[in-house]
A protein has these predicted regions:
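Gly/Pro-rich hinge or "lid" segments in bacterial periplasmic/extracellular proteins
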Residues: 68, 168-228, 233, 347-348, ...
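A structural "hinge/loop" feature
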Residues: 37-53, 75-78, 104, 157-174, ...
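N-terminal lobe/hinge region of extracytoplasmic solute-binding protein
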Residues: 33-86, 116, 123, 198-204
Length: 531
């Protein structure tokens, strides 16, 4: 197809680029090249996306840490231990001696305040809590501190293992230094303005400098309670262009490169001076429409679009090193996960459906996408196949908030995006992000839930997911999650997964201890340089 030829030409040009001359970054500093377009804030309650989560995971701690390799394993964090009661309540015991970078001790009060703050602000991180029934006006009934212990009771029937996992997610449960934060409160904002550009955590590193879309510098916290960081400093440098990151890595100006294009990863994989780490991540690359739009309320229009995406071609040409083909809203390998449906491009069928819906000549639509790989290439591929049925897609590219902002406000038409949970090895993690929508009203403002953003709502699916979550019989639960995926497909939802996210990170061969994380919480305290 025409779009494939364009991608192939770009690949050939990139692979032919000459390598630079190697230099060395300082032995006690880790320099990371990545796009900072989606790092819009440093407030844990407001972050979203891989890059911002990775930064926050090094500035703040959580009560537990989800193991980077074994998805079924939960490790101690600020909590040294925990117990799960028969009624599903989880009680954490704080470790002794942990302090914030300010020197203030980490207390149970800090933990409780951080969670209540998250809910009261109602930003992205609150979406996780609200999907489990916790609200700003009811959290006092379920969350409490007693000495060095924190207890959370279930607000609604749920799997306690998922409750436990929430406390390993920085966006939901990063522990903030209450005393320091409130000393910078303005007009009762709970330090929202200050924490947007500052940090008050107990993580392995402290914030030294942040220049938006330029540079972010972290400095080792020498009194860190856990494993002492090997690096004195971590420097994130804004590099939205893949070839720039590749050349800087080859020259030795950066140690780690995140978000490289497929051609650049392919070229670097042949270089003995670097290593490529490919790890399963979480979430999906997807195409979504807004069901607030009259055209996309019609299931025939949505079904037509399903027939106008070249899933095989996109995954073969664009997605290697970014993702692997996945068309279901549940990650492979979890309980009840179904094989992919056999969706193919069928222009004739799409035209028939559009005519039935009242659009025999198609229509025009704005297609939002980030201006970086693989989003822009995927949007171009979709634009080409949509055009075959008369749908004229105008691609609008931009940085993070320019693209995801309209989606969070439910003021978009069509978008190529990335997301969808999966930070916990459980189908509910994906369903919570993509399928379940507790309240479809505009004023619900559930901006952390993609189902709400797309205005997709099905009461029956909500009920099915709630019942599957609490089913303790393995075979019954498996069948229930299979039925959920079948109904989702039948409804022709507003969001169609295209590819399951794979994280490919390239780093200098002398960098040791770097470990990608499926939940994006890449902690850098274990990283060293072998020179």
């Amino acid at each position: 197809m025409k779009w494939m030829r364009h991608v192939a030409l770009a690949t050939a040009l990139t692979l032919s680029a000459p390598a630079g001359v190697w230099a060395d970054t300082p032995p006690d500093q880790l320099v990371v090249g990545l796009s900072m377009n989606n790092i819009l804030t440093l407030d844990p309650a407001a972050i979203s996306g891989r890059e911002a989560t990775g930064v926050i995971a090094n500035l703040y701690d959580t009560l537990v840490e989800l193991d980077a390799v074994d998805k079924t394993k939960v490790n101690p964090g600020l909590a040294s231990s925990w117990t799960i009661a028969d009624d599903g309540a989880v009680t954490f015991t704080l470790r002794e001696g942990a302090t914030f970078t300010s020197g203030n001790p980490v207390t149970a009060e800090d933990v409780v305040w951080s969670i209540k703050r998250n809910l009261s602000l109602g930003l992205v991180g609150a979406g996780v809590w609200s999907s489990f029934g916790y609200k700003a006006n009811n959290i006092d009934q379920f969350l409490s501190a007693n000495g060095n212990q924190i207890t959370i009771k279930p607000a609604q029937p749920t799997d306690p293992q998922l409750t436990l996992a929430i406390f390993g997610k920085p966006d939901a449960s990063a522990v903030i230094d209450k005393k320091t934060a409130l000393s910078h409160e303005t007009n009762g904002d709970q330090a929202a303005a200050w924490l947007k550009i500052n940090a008050a955590g107990s993580g392995a590193f402290s914030l030294t400098r942040w220049s938006s879309n330029e540079m972010l510098i972290l400095t080792r916290f020498d009194d860190y309670w856990g494993e002492k960081p090997q690096m004195k400093r971590v420097i994130y440098r804004h590099m939205p262009e893949s070839q720039t990151k590749r050349l800087m890595l080859e020259k030795g100006d950066v140690d780690v490169a995140i978000g490289l294009s497929v051609p650049d990863i392919a070229a670097l994989s042949k270089n003995p001076e670097v290593e490529v780490q490919r790890t399963p991540s979480s979430g999906f690359y997807f195409l979504a429409v807004s069901m607030k739009d009259e055209r996309f309320k019609n299931p025939d229009v949505r079904l037509a679009i399903r027939h106008l995406v070249d899933y095989d071609g996109i995954n073969k040409v664009i997605m290697p090193n970014y993702g692997t083909k996945r068309l279901r809203p549940v990650a492979e390998g979890v309980i009840g996960s179904l094989p992919d449906p056999d969706y193919k491009v069928d222009v004739a069928k799409a035209k028939e459906l559009l005519a039935k819906a009242g659009y025999p000549d198609g229509f025009s639509v704005r297609l939002l996408t980030l201006n970086e790989p693989p989003f822009a290439d995927t949007a171009t591929a979709i634009q080409a196949t949509l055009a075959q049925a008369g749908i004229k897609a105008e691609i609008v590219q931009g940085a993070g908030d320019q693209i995801y902002g309209p989606m969070r406000e439910r003021k978009f038409e069509m978008i190529v995006g990335r997301g969808g949970g999966g930070q916990e090895p459980h189908p509910h993690s994906n369903l919570r992000a993509l399928v379940i929508n507790p309240n479809n009203a505009d004023d619900a403002k559930l901006s952390g839930i993609i189902g709400w953003r797309t205005s997709f709502y099905d009461e029956q699916l909500n009920d099915m997911a709630a019942k599957a979550l609490v089913e303790r019989d393995h075979d019954k639960q498996k069948a229930m999650y299979e039925d959920i995926q079948k109904r989702y497909e039948e409804l022709v939802p507003a969001l169609q997964p295209i590819s399951a996210v794979v994280d490919s990170v390239v780093y200098r061969a002398d960098v040791k201890g770097y470990q990608n994380h499926y939940g994006w919480t890449v902690r850098l305290r274990s990283v060293s340089k072998q020179r």
